[in-house]
Amino acid sequence: MIKAVLFDVDDTLYPSSKLAEEARRNAIRAMIEAGLETDLSEEELYRELQEVVKEYGSNHPRHFDLLLRRIGADPEPKLVAAAVVAYHDTKFAYLKPYPDVIPTLMQLREMGFKLGAVTSGLAVKQWEKLIRLGIHHFFHEVVISEEIGVEKPNPKIFIEAARRLGVKPEEAVYVGDRLDKDIRGANRAGMVTVRIRRGKYQDMEPRNDDDVPDFEIDRPRELLDVVRELAKD
């Protein structure tokens, strides 16, 4: 019997990849407007920034300093500050959940399910997202990789989330967008898995049996039919 529903955060509850791209592009424009001298175009600078993010990880605190050094420019505080302000202004202005997320979370709570979030990243950053999205209060538990010491797809983070919610892994449904992180890890933990086809990874194909979800949906409200069907078992 299903007793809990757990969610990934980025690109599952809000358009993370799209928002990050727009914020980074605006940061590039802000540096140019602040006086960055370079022969590279905006698009070339964006590609260089993407390489920095890929190499150092999305949580590195000094992406823009690294970008400037990468292109042979002096990382002047003015340029870095302009990029940081533009980046955060963009993210904060447009950080909103997908339209059907809040009604779905409300209905799941009304149906009596315990709700949880399982996400990789820095704890403060992930909590900030949930609070700014206005959805943190829906979750009984939020489990973040930095606090646990392992990241998806390690099944330990999913098992810990189930433990905190007071349910067995097989009594939990997990919803996420990435087959190689969300679905693989939750499957290995023994949960019922639901892939939501949204964002950057919507066309990803399974690499092995662990990447195959039990269900696929296109939007959160379709999850309600899934849990109703599972409740019959």
Swiss-Prot record:
InterPro entries on file: HAD-like_hydrolase, HAD-like_sf, HAD-SF_hydro_IA, HAD-SF_hydro_IA_CTE7, HAD_sf
Keyword Hydrolase applies: yes
Class of enzymatic activity (EC top level): hydrolase
Gene Ontology molecular function terms on file: metal ion binding; phosphatase activity
UniProt superkingdom: Archaea
Record's keyword terms, sorted: Hydrolase, Magnesium, Metal-binding
Pfam families in the cross-refs: Hydrolase
SUPFAM superfamilies: HAD-like (SSF56784)
CDD domains on file: HAD_Neu5Ac-Pase_like
An annotated GO BP: small molecule biosynthetic process
Gene3D superfamilies named among the record's database cross-references: 1.10.150.520, HAD superfamily/HAD-like
Annotated EC: 3.1.3.-
Residues of the signal peptide: none
Cofactor: Mg(2+)
Function: Catalyzes the dephosphorylation of D,L-glyceraldehyde 3-phosphate in vitro.
Family statement: Belongs to the HAD-like hydrolase superfamily.
Family annotation (NCBIfam families): CTE7 (TIGR02253), HAD-SF-IA-v1 (TIGR01549), HAD-SF-IA-v3 (TIGR01509)
Protein name: Glyceraldehyde 3-phosphate phosphatase
Species, as recorded: Methanopyrus kandleri (strain AV19 / DSM 6324 / JCM 9639 / NBRC 100938)
